[in-house]
Amino acid sequence: MKKFTKVLAVLLAVAVFATAFAACSKNGSTSSKVKVIDIALSDEEYAFGVDKNQPELKQQVNDFVAEIKSNGKLDEICNKYFADGTPEGITSATQDPSKDQLVVATNAEFAPFEYKQGDQFFGIDMEIANLLAQKLNKELVIVDMAFDAVLLSVQQGKADIGMAGLTVTEKRAQQVDFSDSYYSASQKLIVKEDDTTFDNCKTKEDVDAILKGFDSSTTIGGQNGTTGQFYVEGSDDFGFDKLNATWKGYANGSLAVQDLINGGVNYVIIDAAPAAAIANSINAVA
């Protein structure tokens, strides 16, 4: 896992370079609209949430995660999104109780882990789901829903597994059985390109000190139900103290960043990989 985490850290560093450079550079002009403050605000582990009534499936998932880590397949998939690989579109079958299917609950608004283009699903989690279904000799069904509904869907037996960039917490583990971790993640801050508030920050503590100094007149946005919300509102489960800033939730991170540009919020906090993907996408058309 340590080697795997280092590989992903390098790949993610490449992915965020363009936005991080804009945050550090003091020379030259830029047409960028936003920048990512390249300081991790949390340390998290992503895992898949399995139906508690299917212990055999959990073991199969754990075996599969170990396999794709050891044979390099997981690195290969990540390279498609963090480096120079070509993402593969995944087509979902129609759900049919009479068939032997693997039903995956996701929220396809969390690139590069899950997103849609037309009728196809893309992303790290979706490509893993496709390989998992093949390994289990099952037909893959992907059900797209609000992030808040993913674990509930699994808990209620409407889906076999949740694959949606899920951070492992004790509270969430009451709803599902988490697989072994497959990805190490963190939260990062997105600001307007011309915002210099955090330019001199070197550590998480530096960023935290500024964030904790804001009052309710400062609004921080992000995706509903994700770690960013708990970072702002506080959570014993995540170990976050409440900020005095006001939280504003959105269906996805892209909407939050767009509202940042439009002046609807002062800052955005979301997971590092989606932060990089969104910032790069928006700045590419700035």
What are these regions (language model features)?
Residues A18-S32:
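Sec-dependent signal peptide cleavage junction
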Residues G28-S42, D148-L152, A164-Q175, Y231-G234, ...:
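A ligand-binding cleft/hinge motif common to bilobed small-molecule-binding domains
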Residues Y46, E56-E76, K80-D84, D96-L166, ...:
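Extracytoplasmic small-molecule ligand-binding "clamshell" domains
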Residues S29, T106-F110, V143-D148, G157-E170, ...:
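Beta->alpha turn/N-cap motifs
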Residues K33-S42, Q134, E139-A209:
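Acidic, polar ligand-binding/catalytic clefts
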Residues V36-S42, N62-K99, E205-S217, G221-W247:
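Ligand-binding clefts/hinges and TM-proximal coupling segments of bilobed small-molecule sensing domains
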